[in-house]
A protein has these predicted regions:
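A short, charged helix-loop
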Residues: 184-196
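Catalytic cores of carbohydrate-active enzymes
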Residues: 87-88, 153, 157-173, 201-204, ...
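An acidic intrinsically disordered interaction segment
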Residues: 7-29, 85-95, 171-183
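Aromatic-rich carbohydrate-recognition surfaces in CAZymes
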Residues: 47-179, 205-208, 212
């Protein structure tokens, strides 16, 4: 059951209660048979599982209901990319953008049941697992999810960083896919300072911040599990972003 908060400020208590109610209204049960909780992106048009939306919502809801984060991570782990498919933009280790459950008539953008065109869902997956570990996820559950997090980290370097410059960028591989693959995913959502629509490949500053968070999260998990090599490697990657790459990403404009 969700936590309840009572304060002397009735407005704050009412806002908290409304938030709990809204989360409950968007809560789904994964129909795969596991009956684990996940959260939809929004009603009525997005009443299904979206990677980015579910991960951020579950992260923010950790003080209320950590089981939601577990359900989201498990559901996304099962759908994690295994092969290279240009139409769905599936790639090994990539966390999907959206899925349509069996029985839902509307397909994804590219016509299949699952579409992977997201630059940020994959590092967010690792970030959420790291935060859930801090909130007391038991060792067995952590170890069950860890291989998926490591495959996500591998995607960030092998596929997310297409040109080896240290940034995660995106460029759609399907004509029907999303031109922009961050949270502003409308076709005209990303623009240069002069108003021109930015052309991919694009490396969004917030995605680089998520990458930093993912490396830090995996390093923290490595400390907990006694993995000194992982701690050193992920710590170095995070330090490199903080020392230079992330700063340049925030100020550079193509």
């Amino acid at each position: 059951s969700a936590q309840r908060v009572r304060t002397a400020d009735r407005g704050l208590s009412a806002a908290f209660d409304r938030s709990i109610s809204d989360i409950g209204a968007l809560r789904l049960h994964d129909p795969s048979g596991h009956r684990r909780p996940v959260i939809a992106a929004g009603a009525p048009w997005y009443m299904t599982l979206f990677g980015r939306d579910a991960l951020i919502s579950a992260y923010m809801a950790l003080p209320i209901d950590p089981t939601l984060a577990i359900g989201v991570l498990e559901a996304l782990a099962e759908l994690q990319g295994r092969d290279v498919d240009l139409m769905s933009e599936e790639e090994p280790g990539r966390i999907m953008h959206e899925t349509r459950y069996l029985g839902v008539e509307a397909p994804t953008l590219t016509g299949g049941s699952t579409y992977y065109g997201s630059a940020d869902a994959t590092p967010l997956f690792v970030m959420l697992l790291g935060e859930l570990s801090r909130w007391g996820l038991d060792d067995d559950a952590l170890r069950d999810l860890l291989p998926y997090a490591d495959r996500a980290l591998a995607w960030m370097q092998d596929y997310g960083d297409r040109d080896g410059d240290g940034y995660i960028e995106y460029l759609k591989t399907s004509e029907r896919g999303l031109s922009n693959q961050g949270w502003k995913d409308s076709a005209d959502g990303i623009r240069y300072r002069d108003g021109r629509i930015a052309e991919a490949p694009l490396a969004l500053c917030e995605v680089q911040a998520y990458a930093y968070g993912a490396y830090r999260a995996r390093a923290a998990i490595g400390v907990r599990l006694g993995e000194p090599e992982v701690v050193a490697r992920c710590g170095q990657l995070a330090d490199e972003l903080k020392a230079g790459r992330l700063v340049r990403a925030l100020i550079r404009e193509a």
